[in-house]
Amino acid sequence: MRCLPVLIILLLLTASAPGVDVLPKTEDDVPLSSVYGNGKSILRGILRKGICCGVSFCYPC
């Protein structure tokens, strides 16, 4: 029962915290879609070069 007030206070603080969308954008901000796209293209390049990754769908070394 002693934890209930602490839980309620934490819920109230979480609900009143500003969201990520409220933060101002800077020039250094990079959209996440480009980060994920770069990761996919790097992975495609690794698989295309024939590097073994230990599973059957990879190209042979």
From Swiss-Prot:
Disulfide bonds: C52-C61, C53-C58
Signal peptide stretch: 1-19
Record's keyword annotation contains Zinc: no
Propeptide span(s): 20-49
Subcellular location as annotated: Secreted
A single MF term (Gene Ontology): toxin activity
Keywords: Disulfide bond, Hydroxylation, Neurotoxin, Secreted, Signal, Toxin
GO cellular component: extracellular region
Modified positions (4-hydroxyproline) in chain numbering: P60
Tissue and organ expression note: Expressed by the venom duct.
Family note: Belongs to the conotoxin T superfamily.
Annotated domain remarks: The cysteine framework is X (CC-CX[hydroxyPro]C).
Function: Chi-conotoxins inhibit the neuronal noradrenaline transporter (NET/SLC6A2). Induces flaccid paralysis, when injected intra-cerebroventricularly into mice.
Protein name: Chi-conotoxin CMrX
Lineage of producing organism: Eukaryota, Metazoa, Spiralia, Lophotrochozoa, Mollusca
